[in-house]
Amino acid sequence: MKRSRTISMIGAVCTFGLAVATSAVNAADDNQLSVTVAFGRGLNTQGTPVNNVVIPDTIKLKENGVVNFIVAGFHQIVVYNPGKTDDEVVVPGTGTFIDDTNNQFYSGIVPAGGPGALPITTDPSNARNRVESVSFPGPGTYLVICNVRNHFNGGMFAYVQVH
């Protein structure tokens, strides 16, 4: 009798410990100060729609946290302030870039050249295959898009939820 009670207690303690550890991991997922995000699937893909993704497409972050976007290929990160949604982005009918600056929070490196449309100064250029870190100082849901028109039209956008 005493032995079965001891085994039951050990089982209960183990179950409780596992439940606490699991909830701590889930809570940590929503409360990260630094998150790494793939902005493009990778250099081992062709320059096709397969590469034009943001993984994951919902990013959860603590206030004042940082998202490190690992950019693979010809992409430009643009982040909008909370409140703007993907269906509110003004997309021109032609051209390479969208350039909708309304309610814009951050505009990343232009992949066709250096910052601010400067010509490429090195080969290989730092405008492709890079890491861009973006800080999110306030709460809200931020829209992140690829500013390349065809990429955005193909669904290359994500949301950063800051708590």
Q: What is each residue range found by the language model?
A:
Residues 2-11:
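Bacterial N-terminal signal peptides that target proteins for export
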